[in-house]
Every structure is written in C-alpha cells, then in structure tokens.
A protein has these predicted regions:
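Glycine/proline-enriched, intrinsically flexible loops and inter-domain linkers
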Residues: 1-205
C-alpha cells in the first residue's frame, strides 16, 4: 500500500497527538513545528500512478504504529500498545424478499485497541485511524436492512495482549444469508498480529 502526502501528514499528526498532554491544543499552531521527511517515490510519498486504495485505513495504521513505537521507547508511561488490524468482509448480492441488490459492510467485525498506562484497551473499537470514532452497527438493525441472520457475536477469548493492563479484543461472529452472495475480504489484517505490547505488556493474539 501507498500513502498520499495528505494521508501521511494526517496519520503522523494523529499519532503525535496521542502523546500530547490534555491542555495542549491540537491545531495548526502546534503541528507547525513538526517537520516531515517524505522521500518522493516512497510508500509515504508515491509517484503517480501508484495505487493508494484505502490508504486512510491500512498504511495509516502502519504509520501511526511506527511513530507510537518510536515515542513509546522514550516515554513508555505515555505509550499505547498496538491496535489490531481489521479484516471485516463485504457481502454483496440480491435480496429476493425486497427485490433489490445489497452491499453490506461487516463493520461489527472489528479489532480491539491496545492498552495504555492506567486503562485496559477497548474491545471491538474499530479502525485505528478513527480512534474509536466509528459507530459499530446494531445487529438487529442489520437483520432488518439486509437478508441476513446473526447466529452469534462475541468478544474473542484472550485476544487482547496480557500485562498490567490488558489489551482490547476483537470479535468472533457467525452470520448466514438467505440469498446467494459474494464475500470480499481485505487481506491486510491477516498474518502476524499487529497488536504489539507496550510498557512491559505482551502482544495480542
């Protein structure tokens, strides 16, 4: 993945703001003192026609984590442990009962947030770039809007990293549909867990 200059800057500022004291404004005056080195042709400043699909979600996640890990080594008391990466699918098909096509984003299949000093991480919090600002949909609403039925939805057992403060965990769920549907999966959330430990904590599963 590649990141546009605007996305690289916003991800950097967001990562830095997490270390600011509460009384320090999050505005242009504060960030004006920050100098970003973004080599042209790199992943953080690509040349056209480099693809940048969903750069606000996936490579932004890596940028934020890189900054958090660097600053966390200097100030572990302010460090936030890593957040999980999303792998929620998209379902598309035809709703026979309502006779129209549908596209359903599985926003409820979200990862957990890392812990910080003094607080456990939140479970099923959403994408890191939203810092918990994404509203997780209600399953009953989804069952009314789409031709699906949820069999179960539960917090994943021991998904959060152990430590003095426990990391948040993601979701395991089972859903079935009454109609033929195509499922698309984002693969960025596969592979080694991204929920690294901080301040002597351990990584999530």
């Amino acid at each position: 993945k590649n990141s546009s200059i605007a996305n690289t800057m916003s991800a950097t500022y967001m990562a830095l703001a997490a270390f600011f004291p509460a009384n320090l404004p999050r505005n242009e005056g504060t960030f004006r003192s920050v100098s970003l080195v973004m080599p042209e042709g790199s992943a953080v400043n690509p040349r056209p026609p480099a693809p940048m699909t969903m750069n606000t979600v996936f490579i932004a996640h890596q940028i934020i984590h890189a900054i958090w890990q660097a600053l966390g080594s200097a100030r572990p008391d302010l460090a936030c442990a890593g957040w999980g990466r999303a792998i929620h699918p998209i379902s598309a098909g035809h709703d026979g009962a309502r006779d129209h096509d549908f596209i359903m984003y599985h926003w409820h299949g979200m990862p957990g947030a890392g812990a910080v000093e003094g607080r456990d991480g939140f479970g099923q919090i959403g994408h890191l770039n939203a810092l918990g600002g994404l509203t997780i949909p209600n399953l009953e609403d989804y069952e009314q809007l789409y031709p699906v039925r949820y069999i179960r939805q539960e917090l994943r057992c021991d998904g959060g990293g152990p430590g003095k403060w426990r990391g948040g965990t993601g979701i395991e769920y089972t859903v079935e549909t009454d109609n033929p549907a195509v499922f698309y999966f984002r693969s960025e959330g596969l592979g080694p867990p991204s929920g690294y430990g901080a301040h002597d904590g351990h990584a999530g599963a």
